[in-house]
């Protein structure tokens, strides 16, 4: 109940035979927090919070755009008044203009309701602009943790740097070719001794092949496993 989720593709996370009223109120009904006769008013309340008209309560998922569906998904997530909401690539399936409005809505709700938001995302530019803290993962391992506003300037791990170099920016030098990482990616299920990034790291040493680095503090709110 205290942890909720906003999925990447809301259309596949909704029951296509359920109206928005039931989609939003289903978690509340499951926990016995509201009565059936209260569903309409409750659904309208949360639709207003995500900036959708109240008459959307009678719509089915296929009657809405992708952005509208995602707003309903957010309404469902906040209905239980959780402490934290995880957003799994919650804007990647949307148009850029719609992405911006959804992110602005999430940030607004986070401030109003004092909830924590956890973004699972590959878009470093977006993450660095809104996240207070960023954890960079490689093959299921956290390799670096640092403040969002310092990602582009203070990243230290070779993988974090490689990610940043792969992001197109209008200020980048297009005369320089993008250098892909060398080496093979290990299978996610395979056991590997040492650093998980060793096969693709230009700075790999013998120690990297023998010992798995642990996260260590290297600066203010900055941890590195290298």
Question: What is each stretch, according to the model?
Answer:
Residues 18-38, 51, 146:
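ABC-type ATPase nucleotide-binding domains, specifically the catalytic core motifs of the NBD
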Residues 38-55, 164-165:
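Conserved ABC ATPase "signature" region
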Residues 81:
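Conserved catalytic motifs of ABC-family nucleotide-binding domains
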Residues 90, 94, 98-176:
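P-loop NTP-binding/switch modules centered on Walker-like glycine-rich loops
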């Amino acid at each position: 109940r205290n942890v909720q989720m906003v999925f990447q593709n809301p259309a596949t996370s909704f029951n296509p035979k359920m109206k928005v009223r039931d989609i939003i109120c289903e978690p509340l009904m499951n926990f016995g927090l509201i009565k059936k006769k209260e569903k309409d008013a409750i659904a309208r309340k949360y639709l207003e919070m995500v900036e959708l008209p109240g008459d959307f309560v009678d719509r089915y998922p296929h009657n809405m755009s992708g952005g509208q569906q995602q707003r309903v998904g957010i309404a469902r997530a906040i209905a239980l008044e959780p402490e934290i909401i995880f957003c799994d690539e919650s804007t990647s399936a949307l148009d850029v203009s719609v992405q911006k409005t959804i992110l602005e809505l999430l940030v607004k709700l986070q401030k109003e309701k004092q909830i924590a938001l956890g973004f699972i995302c590959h878009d470093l530019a977006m993450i660095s602009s809104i996240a207070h803290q960023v954890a960079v993962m490689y093959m299921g391992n956290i390799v670096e943790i640092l403040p969002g506003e310092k990602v582009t300037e203070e990243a230290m791990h070779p993988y974090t740097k490689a990610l940043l170099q792969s992001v197109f920016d209008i200020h980048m030098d297009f005369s320089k070719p993008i250098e892909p990482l060398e080496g093979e990616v290990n299978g996610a299920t395979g056991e590997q001794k040492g650093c998980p990034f060793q096969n693709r790291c230009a700075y790999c040493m013998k120690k990297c092949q023998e010992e798995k680095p642990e996260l260590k503090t290297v600066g203010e709110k900055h941890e590195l496993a290298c």
